[in-house]
Amino acid sequence: MTHQSRQTRACLLSLGGGRPGSSVDLQNMEDSGPDRRGSVFAGLVGASQVLGLVSVVITGVWMGHYRGGFAWDGSAREFNLHPLCMVLGLVLLHGDAILVYRVFSNEAKKKVKLLHGTIHLLALITSIVGVVAVFDFHSASLIPHLYSLHSWGGLTTLILFSSQWVMGLLFFLFPGASSWLRATYLPIHVFCGLTLLVMAIGTSLLGITEKLLFSIESSYPQFTPEGVLANILGVFLVLFGVLLCYLVTREEYRRPPNPEEEALSVHFKTLTEGGAPATP
């Protein structure tokens, strides 16, 4: 063992009171640290994907089996595309786009950015299809547009989601934005992404309740299979959101620093604490 290694071990042992079996013992740190966190992380990511995919499947079964299937003809079957597209787009794909920075934390940042933006684009397209479907149905059935809290929340979420995607494209994928501009917008972008996911799930819960009251209001209190299935969908959506927020906000799951991120941090610190940046 080199002199430097002996000094390092002595320092670690001194922090634990000199006891080899203490919580800061070097061997224990090596044995129980990253591997254990990695396995927990993988399990949580897997659980989130199961919850998200099952939510989409439940929505498809609900609309396909209990509500008559899917079509693009202005009928109620066209409306059935709305919940399916919104759960797939604004919830599952949106959540997965956020999660790629944790799952692919060791990949090149540019590749992860492209994947993040591409999944968000797919989520946006899918959600627009869902909104067009419900507007078509309302027009064909002479139902007023945008009168419910669900519709207000859904349209607001979609507009903000679209704006979020455009702003992310301008600030992080196009090379025009300076480092200090990106550093200023980065925490806003992260906060808005999670907020929009919460808004999407909350609006979905409103939509589930609204659909049940319109479709099976009289039998809903009798725990009919359709009502129970829709309630389970709501629970799964909430659990998906909780897991996503947990994975994204835990410090140990954050992407390891790289030169680009360190530069952003320097600029952000300069903006918030004052002083001149070390680099232009």
Predicted regions and their residues:
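Juxtamembrane loop segments immediately following a transmembrane helix
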Residues: 163-188, 198-225
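Non-transmembrane, juxtamembrane loop and terminal tail segments
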Residues: 2-33, 256-280
